Amino acid sequence: MKKNVIISLADSNYFELLNELIDSIKRFEESKNIAICILNAGLKNNEIESLSKKVDEIKDANWDIEVPKHKIGQKEWLKSQVSRAFIPNYFTGYEKYLWIDADAWVNSWEAIELYFKGCENKKLAIATSADRSYGRVLRAEWLFKSFATIKSQNYKHAKSSGFSEKIARQVALMPHLNIGVFSLENNAPHWKIWQKNLKQALNKGKIWGSEQIAMNVTIYVDNLPVEILPAYCNWTLINKLKYDQTKNTLVEYYLPNHEIGIVHLAGKNNDHIRYNKEYLSELETLDGNIIKKKLRFNS
């Protein structure tokens, strides 16, 4: 049995993106030693059959924490916000688990190695958007002279998810941890604490984003160990990339222009790319030229 596993989840709407993620992984020789397992949250039978030829295992995602039906509606894919906190229960026997959202793809295997290395010794390996390329991480509403109200994603989500004012303030100014890509060992203490915090978030707040604020609380309030990886290990700022034409790869915008590890097409700003594989994005090359290139994975 393979020791480590990469997991993702999709419904039928994200089937094509999931396929691209899998292909982006399997093109690397190193992937032969890594299992790939998929959680099904609304895939069609023919899609499951197609995926089964590429991956090690496919299982139906469940509502591992009970959620009121009015919060779910017809969005079964929201199971991704819950089931990722329980993946060792779905796919047992692995030493290390690496979750990658279906709307991401692997550009460099270095990122995979960093995630598996980073989670050793019972730590969470995860990236944050607090990076020089991303600009501001907080917003301020200026009230009078030097007085302002600080707007924080962590604070907002913590309050809307029912966490106390004390906890919301504890996480407010900390770098926001992006749970779209993360790695944990099977015996890491984070799983149980994360599940506890997730249950509280789901009880009071929306399903969307609940797993992310729950993990931020787990790290910054419960003080569980973390290895924060560079932003290029989960790059979501798709409009600020450069292209290295010599090496034929995407790189960070600023020097030393490190190769992007995982391209993550998350957020409304990237809808046009997620929903249109043929969309051409303008990219600056390392030579200062402007080229047009597709930013979906193309095998």
Stretches with model-predicted labels:
Residues M1-S299:
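Glycosyltransferase catalytic domains, chiefly GT-A lineage
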